[in-house]
Amino acid sequence: MSTPTSNIPDVQNSADTRHIAINKVGIKSIRHPIKVQDKSAGIQHTIAMFNMYVGLPHNFKGTHMSRFVEILNSHEREISVENFPTMLRDMVVKLEAETGHIEMNFPYFINKTAPVSGVQSLMDYDVTFIGDICHGEIATSVKVVVPVTSLCPCSKKISEYGAHNQRSHVTVTAKTNDFMWIEEIVQLVEQEASCELFGLLKRPDEKYVTERAYDNPKFVEDMVRDVAARLNAEARVDAYVVESENFESIHNHSAYALIENDKKNPLAHA
């Protein structure tokens, strides 16, 4: 025998007597299709992993988890970077919250041309759009993980021939005041690495990238400083965090460095 909806208890809406607010509560790691416009004027259809949270006042026992999924499905396949702020607003309205947070992580593909042979191939990059809303005010940022090659200056200096090199991940999280293509952030990072990566290389290309890295050695410290200098000079970037992790080829650990800067509040990270 079915029970009328009006008679089903709403436990989440009941009062909580502990009087402790929750900063973030919601759903994590839910996949949903999205579309992303790329710089070549094409549309990439991909799958994003979403984390969606709201703040919960001290006097409420719980939030309504099903409503997060309803928000995703209400947009069907029309979720994009452009309507990301709309999703934030919809979420706090539907969840009756003052604050909200959404992370949208997805693979992004860029067509790259090999440096000598000219063969083309796709490279994938890990991208996350991050949005926060507090009392109607929205703040967004983009996080891009760029895989590159790094070659050790010390190894080159002390060795009679060769030098140890490895793949590195340079991660830029940027808060911008104007639109920036994902490709622009990727290119900025790749230009400051020992060498960029490619999906497909022929033998002449492999020779080129090997020698390019050897002629352009960089410590992990060099990498974050050089990328930070470029971001400092980029007027569209208000604040950033740049990280570099070198997956050391001669050690069983990584080398790591981080620089963060809020240009509007330079003393914040002094």
Curated annotation (Swiss-Prot):
Pfam families: GCHY-1. GO terms for biological process: tetrahydrofolate biosynthetic process. GO terms for molecular function: GTP cyclohydrolase I activity. Keywords: Hydrolase. The record marks C152 as: May be catalytically important. It catalyses: GTP + H2O = 7,8-dihydroneopterin 3'-triphosphate + formate + H(+). Pathway: Cofactor biosynthesis; 7,8-dihydroneopterin triphosphate biosynthesis; 7,8-dihydroneopterin triphosphate from GTP: step 1/1. Coiled coil: none annotated. The keyword Metal-binding does not apply. Its EC number is 3.5.4.16. Gene3D superfamilies: Urate Oxidase. InterPro entries: GTP_cyclohydrolase_FolE2, GTP_cyclohydrolase_FolE2/MptA. It comes from the Bacteria. Converts GTP to 7,8-dihydroneopterin triphosphate. Belongs to the GTP cyclohydrolase IV family. This is GTP cyclohydrolase FolE2 2.
